[in-house]
Amino acid sequence: MDERIISSETVDAEEVSFETSLRPQNLSQYIGQDKVKNNLTVFIEAATLRNEALDHVLLYGPPGLGKTTLAMVIAAEMGSQIKTTSGPAIERPGDLATILTSLEPGDVLFIDEIHRLSRAIEEILYPAMEDYCLDIVIGTGPTARSVRLDLPPFTLIGATTRAGLLSAPLRDRFGVIDHLEFYTEEQLTEIVLRTSNILDTKIDDLGAREIARRSRGTPRIANRLLKRVRDFAQVRGNGTVTEKLAKEALTLLQVDPRGLDTIDQKLLHTIIQSFRGGPVGLDTIAASIGEERETIEDMQEPYLLQIGFLQRTPRGRIATETAYNHLGISYEKEV
């Protein structure tokens, strides 16, 4: 049993390969995020008709909602090549300059975790995004001089789980800013059925819905759970994922009916039992359960807020009456 099947923050090479094999090739195949898709369809068609590069796009939202996939789809819809990198991978101005000067007209540059770019790197991006040019310094000391290089028109797509950490000047240079929302149970059921078809896994509608119900609104988690439930179907069942088998498998994996895993439950139990339900600061919670603050902010908190189990206040986090009821703990309202 892997208690991180839900709350794992890392995506290993095997899972990246798995996700790549499942990715849709165009917007019509992309399930969910209808408002974002509808707007992008218009923007892409307009840019194509004008024979221009699409405006720079910022995609933000919790992990696993399809930001990277959507970037790939945008590039495919534009008929463009995509080059991918991440904020932590661009350590020096020269790293970014090398990437920018390798772009061809109409290319898409995708930067994941764009909030982790240093300010020095951001400043190089400003003229590149705004004027399609790159200012580089040649030489050192008194003989140093600045040279401006022209860049081909390109589209930068940035993805982040923490849009609030982006500097205002960088954020303002994106023409399209879209927030990816948690998926509905119906959308996730459709995703599970699509994935099972690609994996050649037999599954009935109720089995797919049970997996979707416990996937906390996140396609990556839905696909991850399907892989594990498929194992149980092959070893302990007849190869078909049914509702009964899905419930049994997910219970053994310690994923409860609302999609909470052991880390989520530990967090809520700590707030309720150690801090009388809160308010309690996030740093204190992190220290109490042995997790990084950033992990809680990215992996646990968004979903717990979404389903009403947690409240964020100026004084700290509070476990709600709904959370008490879910955990079977008596709730006493303060007078």
From Swiss-Prot:
Its main location: cytoplasm. Mg(2+) binds at T68. SUPFAM superfamilies: P-loop containing nucleoside triphosphate hydrolases, Winged helix' DNA-binding domain. SMART domains: AAA. It comes from the Bacteria. It is found in: Cytoplasm. ATP binds at L22, R23, G64, K67, T68, T69, E130, D131, Y132, R173, Y183, R220. InterPro entries: AAA+_ATPase, AAA_lid_4, DNA_helicase_Holl-junc_RuvB, P-loop_NTPase, RuvB-like_N, RuvB_C, WH-like_DNA-bd_sf, WH_DNA-bd_sf. It is an enzyme of class 3 (hydrolase). PANTHER family: HOLLIDAY JUNCTION BRANCH MIGRATION COMPLEX SUBUNIT RUVB, PTHR42848. Belongs to the RuvB family. The RuvA-RuvB-RuvC complex processes Holliday junction (HJ) DNA during genetic recombination and DNA repair, while the RuvA-RuvB complex plays an important role in the rescue of blocked DNA replication forks via replication fork reversal (RFR). RuvA specifically binds to HJ cruciform DNA, conferring on it an open structure. The RuvB hexamer acts as an ATP-dependent pump, pulling dsDNA into and through the RuvAB complex. RuvB forms 2 homohexamers on either side of HJ DNA bound by 1 or 2 RuvA tetramers; 4 subunits per hexamer contact DNA at a time. Has 3 domains, the large (RuvB-L) and small ATPase (RuvB-S) domains and the C-terminal head (RuvB-H) domain. The head domain binds DNA, while the ATPase domains jointly bind ATP, ADP or are empty depending on the state of the subunit in the translocation cycle. During a single DNA translocation step the structure of each domain remains the same, but their relative positions change. NCBIfam families: PRK00080.1 (NF000868), ruvB (TIGR00635). This is Holliday junction branch migration complex subunit RuvB. It comes from Listeria monocytogenes serotype 4b (strain CLIP80459).
